[in-house]
Amino acid sequence: MPGKHHETVRVIDSKVGGKLLPIVFGTGSAHAVLWPGNGAHYRSLHLIDLHPGDRTCDLSHASECIYYVERGSGTIRGIDDGTAQDLVEGAMFHIGVGDAYRIEAGPQGMRLIGGTVPVDPAFYELSQFEVAR
């Protein structure tokens, strides 16, 4: 964990100072709202908008990860074992350290909110080239 930090409360506008994350295959998008680039140390927060038929690239993190399905539906798929779990509006899911997964949108698309705890700095160094591999 990072060293000493001042205890402060900050309001973060999700439309300002975020980082586009090149993790979506399709017409949707993913943005980091709370990430190391704006001072996050203990957790990250991402908004992932997947349109119908979109999916994320295969993902894995050096930290635990939790997401909430704000709207829509889809599937979370384990890459290593091929397991799949349906996701509906209001669902939450946890990804363990090092587990590989992919999120796939259903026919209405889906919006997710979540991220890693603690922050996984390597995640923000992904390039479009690395994601396409």
Model-derived features: positions:
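A short beta-loop-beta micro-motif enriched in histidine and acidic residues
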Residues: 35-44, 51-68, 80-81
